[in-house]
Amino acid sequence: MIIKNANIVTLNDTFIGSINFNETILNIDKGNLNNSNAIDFEGDYLLPGFIELHTDNLEKHFIPRPNAIWPNKIAAAIANDNEIISSGITTVFDAILVGNYTKIRTSILDDIITSITRGKDLGLFKADHHLHYRCELSDPELLETLEKYYDNKYIALASLMDHTPGQRQWRNKEKMLEFYGKGSNFTSHGAYDFDEKMLRLEETAKEAEKKNRPKVSTIWREKKIIMASHDDTTEEHVNEASKNGIYISEFPTTLEAVKQAKKLKMKTVLGAPNFIRNKSHSDNVSVNDLVDNNFDLVDIFSSDYVPLSLIQSVFKLLDKGCLLYTSQSPRDTVR
């Protein structure tokens, strides 16, 4: 297959040209191509596929409406794959919640992992899927739950999360109640029923986090699985992650945490939906403000819960004057 008249984006350049491919790229040429059989892009961009490190979009296909769990799990996984690939994402780390703080999401854990595993084994997906375990450290039963799944052959990334009320992302408890409680459209209809005992048993969650963090970190280090620290809020959070051999700060919630992560040479992953919306859904640091402050504060964008936001973020960055590639002068910024 040949595509012509495309604005081709490569590692070090963008140019109008053509590309010939058959499963893999055969050749790329600059300039116009006189071939009536080629697909004419009419100057539209042709970009490499995106790599998505953290998206829980799959869960929406398993629970498309409140309390409505989709019965055909493979079909749900394929529907998610179609959305992922149509958003320009060719490699995806499906972020799967391991640990209990919403009952309905816990109930689909086994089905989600099984569907990704079977879909990969059977070659049903267009994108290349990997498992990313979001380990909820505040769950006293996390280690028992994790034991059933940590030997899956497709696990490639693990993030250490702490959603204890009053900590990290939910340091503002009112925002937590608004998100999971009566103010939530999900909960008001009975789904994503936030387990309010988490608020009543805040101390239990803190104790679980303290016990689980070193043990879970050890498990992943021994299995040579890359880890990310989730929702870092203070310098202490970032320092602790770095001491545990973690090099990724995923969705840091404050400017303080972002700057400390960069100081320790950790990679920062920020939410593309936050960037596109100009604000966080839970009142955390605005990615738009970070980018305006310094492009270098953000290493990686994640589509999180909106797959299409990843490619939209690229063009918003260009509108802000960020270079699409670093080896050219500012006059070559692509808009």
Walk through the language-model features, giving the residues of each.
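Metal-coordinating catalytic core of metallo-dependent amide/deamination hydrolases
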Residues: 98-103, 107-232, 304
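Single conserved hydrophobic/aromatic residue that forms the stacking wall/gate
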Residues: 325-335
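Active-site-adjacent C-terminal substructures of enzyme catalytic domains
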Residues: 131, 226-327
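Histidine-rich, glycine-flanked metal-binding segment
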Residues: 1-2, 8-47
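Structural signature of the urease/amidohydrolase superfamily beta/alpha-barrel
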Residues: 1, 23-24, 242, 249, ...
